[in-house]
């Protein structure tokens, strides 16, 4: 067994040669080798956006003069540096900042996911942990990525620190994905429970992250520029690890250091769109009604410097580099994959069919109808940075295997009470799509994973699939359609082939949305 694994690892490191020699055993070896490559590539992708190296590149401190440089801006430190943070990656960001800034840091407060310190310690990731006698106070909360009382206490502690600052002080704000849930501070009389219920209803009806954040900001003391306002007149530097498509700073963690550009009318439009305006609690109506006469958040944030440290684009650039080193012709399709997960899955499924046809039949390719349908699906998704033409041209000109890379956050409309996440649901739906298309002599594998290591309320980061998924599942007595109808993708993957198709990384300490890999290897 050990010898067989060594052979497979060798194959995973040498994809430029043929992986298939014919026969079921060879095909199984190819499948395992591709899966190993996919896992390695995902690890490299995540490694490119870990908080420590990112902070070290963004910050530099002159130990003699106490001058802190943030990109091209300079700040003088003289026992006037404070720190707050919130998000899934903030523990590691704070540890890196503490290591760099040392005794210059006076005080800090961070809000991080429940159990993350124990998880990092258990995983041996000491670089993600604060020093034993740290000046940074840590609050853990937002279990299952939902705002709760513990996160509320953290938010109030952050607000208290910010409100105590003066014009001589500098506030370093660390922000990453998951920050919205970890910084809940509703505007009275709205309660945490009321705000949470409204957010859940919107999410269940398919609201986008941008729409959710618009509502959150309107009902929050700290989001939508509220934290920047609380810290005024202190200087504020926000270091942001983006988990939002396109990296809009006003959307990431609901923009606590960016003045909100949305009006009450924007909120009412969203609530109308999802049929919730007439069902609003009285407290929410009260806050929205007075917002026009008493605008929340500062009109400007001239005292704030917002810096994007890392993003999905940075992660995929590393994935492309690593895939090419493995012998693939690699193309980044898009860093802005959005839309309904069903539509995204259909696009990936047909993309595999069309690209696979070009690889299997050079000079012939897919039918005109299939090509046209692929471009129609792409147009429906409205992806601003989609490189579909470039990807297909690369496939046509490729002498060997191809890896198509993408990132973003598809939306899952909840219809059942199953357990899953958008990455596992996307992978399962793509598996179904792959099984519907004849892929000929091309070996195909699709992987979808969350860079934070947690896909929904599960312990998996995502999953990978192959065209044989539906038939193999049926042989095990598993009906894929039933699991999808109940949004129960995690349960499916746990049962299917003993969970072998699940992607397990543990909490990574970073978060730059999701990564999607489509591997196409000619036999």
Curated annotation (Swiss-Prot):
Keywords: Acetylation, ATP-binding, Cytoplasm, Kinase, Nucleotide-binding, Phosphoprotein, Transferase. Its main location: cytoplasm. GO terms for biological process: protein phosphorylation. Signal peptide: none annotated. It catalyses: (R)-glycerate + ATP = (2R)-3-phosphoglycerate + ADP + H(+). The keyword Phosphoprotein applies. It comes from the Eukaryota. The modification Phosphoserine is found at residue 60. Its EC number is 2.7.1.31. Disulfide bonds: none annotated. The keyword Disulfide bond does not apply. InterPro entries: GK-like_C_sf, GK_N_sf, MOFRL, MOFRL_assoc_dom, MOFRL_protein. GO terms for molecular function: ATP binding; glycerate kinase activity. GO terms for cellular component: cytoplasm; cytosol; Golgi apparatus. The modification N6-acetyllysine is found at residue 200. Belongs to the glycerate kinase type-2 family. This is Glycerate kinase. It comes from Bos taurus. The gene is GLYCTK.
């Amino acid at each position: 067994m050990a010898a067989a694994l060594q052979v497979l690892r060798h194959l995973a490191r040498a994809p430029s040669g043929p992986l298939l020699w014919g026969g079921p055993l060879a095909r199984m070896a190819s499948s395992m080798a591709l899966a190993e490559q996919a896992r390695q590539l995902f690890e490299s992708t995540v490694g490119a956006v870990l908080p420590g190296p990112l902070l070290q590149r963004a910050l530099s401190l002159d130990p003699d003069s106490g001058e802190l440089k943030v990109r091209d801006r300079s700040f003088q430190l003289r026992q006037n540096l404070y720190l707050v943070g919130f998000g899934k990656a903030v523990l590691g960001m704070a540890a890196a900042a503490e290591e760099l800034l040392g005794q210059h840091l006076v005080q800090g407060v961070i809000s991080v996911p429940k159990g993350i310190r124990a998880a990092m310690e258990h995983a041996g990731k000491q670089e993600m942990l604060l020093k034993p006698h740290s000046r940074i106070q840590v609050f853990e909360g937002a279990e299952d990525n939902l705002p709760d009382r513990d996160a509320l206490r953290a938010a109030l502690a952050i607000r208290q620190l910010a409100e105590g600052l003066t014009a001589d002080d500098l506030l370093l704000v660390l922000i990453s994905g998951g920050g919205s849930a970890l910084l809940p501070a509703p505007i009275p009389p709205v309660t945490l429970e009321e705000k949470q219920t409204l957010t859940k209803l919107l999410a269940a009806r398919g609201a986008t992250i941008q729409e959710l954040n618009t509502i959150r900001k309107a009902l929050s003391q700290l989001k939508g520029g509220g934290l920047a306002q609380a810290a005024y007149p202190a200087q504020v530097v926000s270091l942001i690890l983006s988990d939002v498509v396109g990296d809009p700073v006003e959307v990431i963690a609901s923009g606590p250091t960016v003045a909100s550009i949305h009006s009450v009318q924007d909120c009412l439009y969203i609530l109308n769109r999802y049929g919730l305006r007439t069902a609003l609690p009285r407290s929410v109506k009260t806050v929205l009604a007075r917002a026009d006469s008493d605008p929340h958040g500062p009109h400007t944030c001239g005292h704030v410097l917002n810096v994007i440290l890392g993003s999905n684009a940075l992660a995929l650039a590393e994935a492309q580099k690593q895939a090419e080193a493995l012998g693939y012709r690699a193309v980044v399709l898009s860093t802005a994959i959005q839309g309904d997960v069903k539509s995204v899955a259909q696009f990936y499924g047909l993309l595999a069919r069309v690209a696979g046809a070009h690889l299997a039949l050079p000079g012939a390719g897919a039918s005109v109808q299939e090509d046209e349908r692929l471009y129609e699906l792409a147009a429906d998704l409205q992806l601003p940075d989609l490189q579909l033409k470039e990807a297909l041209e690369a496939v046509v000109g490729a002498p060997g295997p191809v890896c198509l890379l993408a990132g973003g956050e598809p939306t899952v409309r909840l219809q059942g009470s199953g357990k899953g996440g958008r990455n596992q649901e996307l992978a399962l739906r793509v598996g179904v799509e792959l099984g519907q298309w004849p892929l000929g002599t091309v070996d195909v594998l699709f992987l979808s994973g969350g860079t934070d290591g947690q896909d929904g309320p599960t312990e998996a980061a995502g999953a990978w699939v192959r065209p044989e998924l539906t038939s193999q599942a049926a042989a095990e007595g598993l009906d894929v359609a039933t699991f999808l109808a109940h949004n129960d993708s995690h349960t499916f993957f746990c049962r299917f082939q003993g969970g072998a198709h699940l992607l397990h990384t543990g909490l990574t300490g970073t978060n730059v949305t999701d990564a999607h890999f489509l591997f196409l290897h000619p036999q």
